[in-house]
């Protein structure tokens, strides 16, 4: 789970959607000694432009350095520190759970429905579940499933954007 501690920042960046950009951004953090807690990258609303969501720790001075350095990269179009209270954050989790009996399957399906997840695959001894939400919701869901035996787990980490009509 990515906990939003006081010195944790959500940085959103619009970048050219082409090979090598992620490597250059990650390299910048490495060279400066900044730790990336999480990074997600995907298409934006504009063709050829990707949105990066970077979760990083540091005080305001560190955040200012990160922002300035990101803005210097040629492939970076825009950078913004997102205010946690004014931000919508979500992540995706897929989890394969041991479920050989009908009663276990039934209980897992009930938990999945309560957490508004979906069963995306079924096999004779396992269910694969997809759930989205904030990190705390996903952590709570996984805690319930641990008793059944988690066979595989994949989490995207948070992606974020500003609430309301404000855009990058």
Curated annotation (Swiss-Prot):
It catalyses: 2 pyruvate + H(+) = (2S)-2-acetolactate + CO2. Pathway: Amino-acid biosynthesis; L-isoleucine biosynthesis; L-isoleucine from 2-oxobutanoate: step 1/4; Amino-acid biosynthesis; L-valine biosynthesis; L-valine from pyruvate: step 1/4. GO terms for biological process: isoleucine biosynthetic process; L-valine biosynthetic process. GO terms for cellular component: cytosol. Pfam families: ACT_AHAS_ss, ALS_ss_C. Its EC number is 2.2.1.6. GO terms for molecular function: acetolactate synthase activity; acetolactate synthase regulator activity. It is an enzyme of class 2 (transferase). The keyword Transit peptide does not apply. Keywords: Amino-acid biosynthesis, Branched-chain amino acid biosynthesis, Transferase. Residues 10-84 form the ACT domain. It comes from the Archaea. The keyword Amino-acid biosynthesis applies. Belongs to the acetolactate synthase small subunit family. Dimer of large and small chains. This is Probable acetolactate synthase small subunit. It comes from Methanothermobacter thermautotrophicus (strain ATCC 29096 / DSM 1053 / JCM 10044 / NBRC 100330 / Delta H) (Methanobacterium thermoautotrophicum).
């Amino acid at each position: 789970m990515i906990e939003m501690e006081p010195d944790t920042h959500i940085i959103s960046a619009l970048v050219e959607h082409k090979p090598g950009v992620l490597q250059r951004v990650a390299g910048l953090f490495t060279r400066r000694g900044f730790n990336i807690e999480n990074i997600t990258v995907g298409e934006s609303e504009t063709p050829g432009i990707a949105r990066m969501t970077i979760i990083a720790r540091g005080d305001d001075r560190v955040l200012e350095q990160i922002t300035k350095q990101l803005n210097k990269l040629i492939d970076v179009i825009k950078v913004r520190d997102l205010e946690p209270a004014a931000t919508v954050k979500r992540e995706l989790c897929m989890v394969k759970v041991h479920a050989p009996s009908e009663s276990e399957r039934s209980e897992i399906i009930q938990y999945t429905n309560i957490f508004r997840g979906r069963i995306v695959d079924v096999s004779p001894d396992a269910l694969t579940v997809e759930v989205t939400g904030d990190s705390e919701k996903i952590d709570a869901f996984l805690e319930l499933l641990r008793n059944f035996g988690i066979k595989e787990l994949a989490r995207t980490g948070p992606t974020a954007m500003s609430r309301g009509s404000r855009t990058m």
